[in-house]
């Protein structure tokens, strides 16, 4: 009887341990299910939970996907303004870079006009000589300016320049040559003077890019060295 009681007590303890382990396992599973359900409930709106059914579109996973997509679209729409601002800044920087590149590609030569040293642009892309209003003011040539006679005629000019007046006799000293040539006055803030193709042809000019020289004349040739474009704006500012 004594041994039987020991066996019975041992079997009861084993049974209790198994039941306790089973209860712990059930509690863990219940907690896991509650956690998953709570996590989904936190992500889903209450109206979405009420409408859950057998349809695939009303399952938690699909509702979450739709909500996530709507949130991303909303963020994308709200982010369009700063993106547009970045694009504008990028375009502005690109425009400034192109302008600087154009200035670096200019061919400049030193000359004299109205007793002042001037950097003139050798412009083979324009037929006419051009001088800006700013350059006219700087050189004191206002009294030589006349109204543009051919108002109905639109000159072919680069960079969408607008002719406002003209100078019939613009005296320019280029090397040892003294030129008396017409020039169109353009509405431009830059203090530029440019020699057009018409004048360059009359001087029988050759542009030597290897030697960086403007060669004038056919028999008695004269070479005018190019001017560095880097100092153009600084020279214009100091001369103003």
UniProtKB/Swiss-Prot annotation:
SUPFAM superfamilies: Acid proteases (SSF50630). It holds the Pfam family Asp_protease. GO terms for molecular function: aspartic-type endopeptidase activity. CDD domains: NRIP_C (cd05480). GO terms for biological process: proteolysis. It comes from the Eukaryota. InterPro entries: NRIP_C, Peptidase_aspartic_DDI1-type, Peptidase_aspartic_dom_sf. This is Nuclear receptor-interacting protein 3. The gene is NRIP3.
């Amino acid at each position: 009887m004594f041994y039987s009681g020991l066996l019975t007590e041992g079997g009861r303890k084993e049974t209790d341990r198994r039941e306790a382990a089973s209860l712990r396992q059930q509690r863990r599973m219940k907690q896991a299910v509650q956690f998953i359900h709570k996590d989904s409930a936190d992500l889903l709106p209450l109206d979405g939970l009420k409408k859950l059914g057998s349809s695939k579109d009303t399952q938690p996973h699909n509702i979450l996907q739709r909500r996530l997509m709507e949130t991303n679209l909303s963020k994308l729409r709200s982010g369009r303004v700063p993106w547009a601002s970045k694009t504008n800044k990028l375009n502005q920087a690109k425009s400034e870079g192109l302008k600087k590149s154009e200035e670096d590609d200019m061919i400049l030569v030193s000359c004299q006009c109205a007793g002042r040293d001037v950097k003139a642009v050798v412009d083979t892309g324009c037929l006419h000589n051009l001088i800006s209003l700013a350059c006219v003011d700087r050189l004191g040539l206002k009294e030589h300016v006349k109204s543009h006679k051919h108002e109905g005629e639109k000159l072919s000019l680069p960079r969408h320049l607008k002719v406002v007046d003209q100078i019939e006799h613009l005296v320019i000293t280029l090397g040892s040559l003294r030129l008396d040539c017409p020039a169109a006055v353009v509405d431009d803030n830059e203090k530029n003077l440019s020699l057009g193709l018409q004048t360059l042809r009359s001087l029988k000019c050759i542009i030597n890019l290897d030697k960086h020289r403007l060669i004038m004349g056919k028999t008695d040739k004269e070479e005018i060295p190019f001017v560095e474009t880097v100092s153009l704006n600084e020279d214009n500012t100091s001369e103003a």
